[in-house]
Design a protein with these regions (language model features):
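Short, low-complexity N-terminal intrinsically disordered segments enriched in polar/charged residues
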Residues: 1-35, 39-59
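Short, structured coil/loop segments at alpha-helix boundaries
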Residues: 15-20, 46, 73-77, 149, ...
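Solvent-exposed, non-transmembrane amphipathic alpha-helical segments
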Residues: 49, 61-65, 73, 164, ...
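Low-complexity, intrinsically disordered terminal/linker segments enriched in charged
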Residues: 110-176
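Lipid interaction determinants
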Residues: 3, 23, 105-108, 160-165
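Surface-exposed, charged secondary-structure patches
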Residues: 2-17, 53-55, 59-133
Length: 176
């Protein structure tokens, strides 16, 4: 995967950073998905992704969008589990079941730009070691955007960067 460069030279690959907040954010997100903690999943999502999920919920539930918007991250909002369920189901299905989510390794972060980074989800390949690209294919990518001083999972960037990298989108099976 390469990043776009405004100059005439060839695109440069993203910078790899081995200790980056997205690694912990990815682990936190996958754990929340594995244990079906809707509030924790919601807290890990970007504003745009939350809006997309609220819109998806509104369409499925046949309610006005303004009634679906503003889902509270606390367990007190009954809509939260319904809004997050399609995303969770998509991830669990794409990654082989809730019980396998803890087996994925998290790569060093790839920094696309100041506000975008991604990590690769590496399948369980045994003991900790440096792996080659062939060892982790097929893998998945999880993209983050930096907003409100946090790195948050972003559905749109994950889809876009997954396609660019030729990887399956772990969030892409969300359907009506």
């Amino acid at each position: 995967m390469t990043t776009k460069n405004s100059g005439a030279s060839a695109p440069r690959p993203p910078k790899v950073q081995f200790e980056h907040p997205t690694q912990l954010a990815a682990t936190t997100f996958l754990r929340a998905v594995a244990v079906d903690d809707a509030a924790a999943i919601w807290e890990c999502l970007s504003r745009e992704t939350r809006g997309l999920l609220e819109g998806h919920y509104a369409a499925r539930a046949a309610v006005a969008l303004h009634r679906a918007a503003g889902v509270a991250p606390s367990g007190e909002d009954a809509r939260l589990a319904l809004v997050v369920a399609p995303l969770r189901d998509s991830i669990v299905g794409a990654l082989g079941g809730a019980e396998t989510l803890g087996g994925f390794g998290i790569s060093g972060a790839r920094i696309v730009d100041r506000a975008t980074a991604y990590v690769l989800l590496l399948p369980d390949f045994g003991e900790e070691r440096i792996v080659t690209e062939i060892d982790w294919r097929p893998s998945h990518l999880l993209a983050f955007v930096h907003e409100s001083r946090e790195w948050l999972v972003d559905l749109g960037r994950t889809a876009e960067l997954s396609v660019d990298a030729g990887l399956p989108d772990p969030l892409g099976a969300i359907r009506r």
